[in-house]
């Protein structure tokens, strides 16, 4: 049986202080409705990191999943790029 479509996002880890949880900031560019300037908007997602492998400033891929807690609806798929 195949899984349904799940959203994925690439973002930067902003916090890894919690156990098995990371906070990922995802940048989205939107055009201002009146003035047309492109603005960077940031959304923060709490994601499940089972092995505590992601660290601050890592670039990560997260995927939507079932609710894991009050705020967690995402999980870590892979670390795209390690922080320098």
From Swiss-Prot:
Any one GO molecular-function label of the UniProt entry: structural constituent of ribosome
Keywords recorded for this protein, A-Z: Ribonucleoprotein, Ribosomal protein, RNA-binding, rRNA-binding
Superkingdom, taxonomy of origin: Bacteria
Cellular component terms per the entry's GO annotation: cytosolic small ribosomal subunit
Gene Ontology biological-process annotations: translation
Gene3D superfamilies, per database record: Nucleic acid-binding proteins
InterPro entries per the UniProt record, alphabetical: NA-bd_OB-fold (IPR012340), Ribosomal_uS17 (IPR000266), Ribosomal_uS17_bact/chlr (IPR019984)
Pfam families: Ribosomal_S17
The keyword Hydrolase is annotated on this UniProt entry: no
HAMAP family listed in its UniProt record: Ribosomal_uS17_B
Summary of the function given for this chain in its UniProt record: One of the primary rRNA binding proteins, it binds specifically to the 5'-end of 16S ribosomal RNA.
Subunit-structure text: Part of the 30S ribosomal subunit.
UniProt-listed PANTHER family: 40S RIBOSOMAL PROTEIN S11 FAMILY MEMBER, SMALL RIBOSOMAL SUBUNIT PROTEIN US17M
Family: Belongs to the universal ribosomal protein uS17 family.
Protein name: Small ribosomal subunit protein uS17
Organism listed in the record: Clostridium kluyveri (strain ATCC 8527 / DSM 555 / NBRC 12016 / NCIMB 10680 / K1)
Organism classification: Bacteria, Bacillati, Bacillota, Clostridia, Eubacteriales
């Amino acid at each position: 049986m195949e899984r349904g479509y799940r959203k994925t996002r690439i973002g930067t880890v902003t916090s890894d202080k919690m156990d098995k949880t990371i906070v990922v900031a995802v940048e989205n560019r939107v055009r201002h409705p009146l003035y047309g300037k492109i603005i960077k908007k940031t959304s923060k997602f709490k994601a499940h990191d089972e092995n505590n492998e992601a660290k601050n400033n890592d670039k990560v891929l997260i995927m939507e999943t079932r609710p894991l807690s009050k705020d967690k609806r995402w999980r870590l798929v892979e670390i795209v790029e390690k922080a320098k």
